[in-house]
Design a protein with these regions (language model features):
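Acidic/histidine-rich catalytic neighborhood of metal-dependent amide-processing enzymes
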Residues: 1-34
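Metal-dependent amide/peptide-bond hydrolase catalytic core
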Residues: 20, 27, 36-174
Length: 174
């Protein structure tokens, strides 16, 4: 239903996702949402950090807060938890300098009912809080990938025919 609402597919369409599943037929798939989060601060010498705004510190607050939110998202019966991974962090250039920039590369895997809009709302709320708490910090983000989840349709003719074809070919029940 989510994919139809977002006009990724029409209601009468069938979707066949061929990602590796160890030969098993899966009836649903998590969505994928990628972000580049850009934290801008103010550089200063480490001997006077109060003159700067530490972008890495602000990024760490963002990471902790969004991780806590993901831990409280509902669990999907088949797909499990929505997850967030901070795959890469870049920032700072010398240990004696308050870092004025930090970028976080984030991979979110979303299970129903968690949508990209829900995640973006949480991002925006956390960003506003951090920018208020730490003067001189500005946070922005780019969405660099967005594929919605696919929910199952147990009555699908495609699924029924696929299961029958696999069983006939492999002699194993799916």
């Amino acid at each position: 239903d989510h994919n139809v609402e977002q006009e990724f597919v029409k209601k009468e369409d069938y979707v066949l996702d061929l990602e590796p599943t160890d030969g098993e037929i899966q009836m649903a798939h998590k969505g994928r949402l990628w972000f580049h989060v850009h934290v801008k601060g103010i550089t200063a010498h480490a001997s006077k950090p109060e003159k700067g705004a530490d972008a890495i510190f602000a990024a760490s607050k963002f990471i902790v807060q969004i991780q806590e939110i993901f831990e409280h998202f509902p669990v999907h019966e088949e797909l499990g938890y929505s997850t967030i991974t901070f795959g890469q962090i870049q920032g700072g250039y010398q240990p004696y300098v308050v870092p004025d920039a930090c970028t976080i590369f984030i991979d979110c895997r979303l299970a129903p009912p968690v949508t990209d809009q829900i995640v973006v709302q949480h991002f925006n709320k956390i960003i506003k809080e951090i920018e208020t708490q730490i003067p001189g910090i500005k946070i922005s983000y780019d969405i660099t990938g967005n594929r919605p989840y696919i929910e199952k349709n147990p009555g699908s003719i495609l699924l029924k025919n696929l299961k029958e074809a696999v069983e006939a070919e492999t002699k194993r029940s799916r």
